[in-house]
Amino acid sequence: MDGEEPARRRRSLRGGIRSASGIGVVQASLSLVVQASSFDTMSDLVAPLRPKRKKVWVDYFVQFRWILVIFVVLPISWTLYFLTYLGDVKSERKSFKQRQKEHEENVKKVVARLKQRNASKDGLVCTARKPWIAVGMRNVDYKRARHFEVDLSAFRNIIEIDKERMIARVEPLVNMGQITRVTVPMNLALAVVAELDDLTVGGLINGYGIEGSSHIYGLFSDTVVAYEIVLADGRVVRATKDNEFSDLFYTIPWSQGTLGLLVSAEIKLIPIKEYMKLTYKPAVGNLKDLAQAYVDSFTPRDGDQDNPEKVPDFVEGMVYSATEGVFMTGRYASKEEAKKKGNVINSVGWWFKPWFYQHAQTALKKGEFVEYIPTREYYHRHTRCLYWEGKLILPFGDQFWFRFLLGWMMPPKVSLLKATQGEAIRNYYHEMHVIQDMLIPLYKVGDALDFVHKEMEVYPLWLCPHKLFKFPYKTMIYPEAGFELHRRQGDTSYAQMYTDVGVYYAPGPVLRGEVFDGAGAVRTMESWLIENHGYQPQYAVSELDEKSFWRMFDAGLYENCRKKYGAVGTFMSVYYKSKKGRKTEKEVQEAEQAHLETPIAEVDDDEDDQPAD
């Protein structure tokens, strides 16, 4: 958009408000969206482009939701965080033998529970985790049908940190805050550490996980060395990329736990240093200019993508408007380097510090600058404000007085935000708020920014690159055919460079009180992704029908493994698990029976599912 009025609209959104990547932290975050007076503080928009929307009762409930958050959600959240911390410390003090013994006993309980299931009478297998606990945008409607519960709540221990093999063996409910608290003092870390403390290993593997180091190591699941899985028949198997269960190993990511129950994972560790040297680079121009500045920040134009001298350890971008963005690159630095005279150390983890996305935005005024951030604080830089969703949850949460007095209780626990809302509120958020990640080839990032601006008008946008590897098997997500021949900027012979365009916040029309079709916007986005070989992480609300779902993702290897390992008829298929809306037991059972009786439809030839030579 190039006119004067759109330019004012872009400037009005510059105050920076954004939502959590990947994650569905924002189901309760529209507490400010219905306050027209609050909009004026963020926007001087004029002449709305769409008809005004009539208010409904939910608008008024959401308008004052911050009261519930401050007096109920935040205190309970802090208490739960503290109790969880005490439990984690207790676990860490146990010996390896104790943790291993507990793990083996808990696995036996899972096997025994599975064997109690009567396939003719009981529903499909689901975990006993309550729907509101999951850190995701979906309503988890599949658990509203009759189902057979298996309790995995005991699987939250770090079993072992093996410094010789550089492997962390962990259980699925171990979260990012827990594992960095253990590994960072050892100058070790997972190769990919998702930003938010509450994100669990199981969710990042079975679903989707990304971080600023993914342009080197790929998605979170790409850093896993082995999975320990309980199959439908109760067998416990260890799947690696080169053993007899290699097909299962490559199928687990993105499967949403529909092939078996993950009970532990062995994940790659890397050596790190005490600080992150972070460079903030502002960029101005149109969206194509911003896209190229982002690409140039971490991809050498000579194609030398594997050269650590030319490629930073961490990359992140934030597009604050259609004309402004800030791109950050980080490199690990020693304590000695950070404390040299003249260097600036910024401990962003203190509760009273400015929220990170707002701090980064200052580069637009003061120009490029460099600072050193303690490594663990850098990893979790977006936790306290949930990217920029904190601004919607608590409209005054970024003010110094609030940060100083109550910032130590932030963030509100996502599970409690979800637990304190009903179905009508959840559906309201689905229509009035966008929480989506668009994974697209890096060379199309400019087109993606253009698309989001025209269809949703959401700012800020979060940019994070990741490698999409070419595997021996064709997995649910895979690179474009022939990418290695084109060798576009960022690509290598073994991986195509993709990027996440994180779209989290209330769209411009909603902020202006105009009519907005949230479901329609998501459908348009999904069609655009399919046409551009992109992917939609399944934590988000999806409008895809089954045919379109399997146009976006590849079904071949997944369905073969479902049948081979007995998951059909025991675990719900990934489409039905991610499908929007309530599923009846009859609907799910009929779908499962159809898979048992008919061959796989509309998938690639069998040779695509065999190991490459």
Residue ranges and their predicted role:
Residues D2-D613:
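Noncatalytic alpha-helical scaffold of FAD-dependent oxidoreductases
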